[in-house]
Amino acid sequence: MKVKPSVKPICDKCKVIRRHGRVMVICENPRHKQRQG
């Protein structure tokens, strides 16, 4: 899980979602997981 000030989809499998008011990227590739904060 990468924590970044701005999250962007890296590949076409990445999805940007909101969970508990946090913007996150979920993907098949675990290295693409990101959370804003």
Curated annotation (Swiss-Prot):
Tell me yes or no: is Ligase among this UniProt entry's keywords: no
Q: Which of UniProt's keywords are assigned here?
A: Ribonucleoprotein, Ribosomal protein
Q: Which PROSITE patterns match?
A: RIBOSOMAL_L36 (PS00828)
Source taxon at top rank: Bacteria
Which GO terms fall under molecular function for this chain's record? structural constituent of ribosome
Which cellular component terms (GO) are annotated to the entry? cytoplasm; ribonucleoprotein complex; ribosome
Q: Which GO terms describe its biological process?
A: translation
Provide the coiled-coil residue spans.
Answer: none
Which Cys residues form disulphide pairs?
Answer: none
The family assignment reads: Belongs to the bacterial ribosomal protein bL36 family.
Q: What is this protein called?
A: Large ribosomal subunit protein bL36
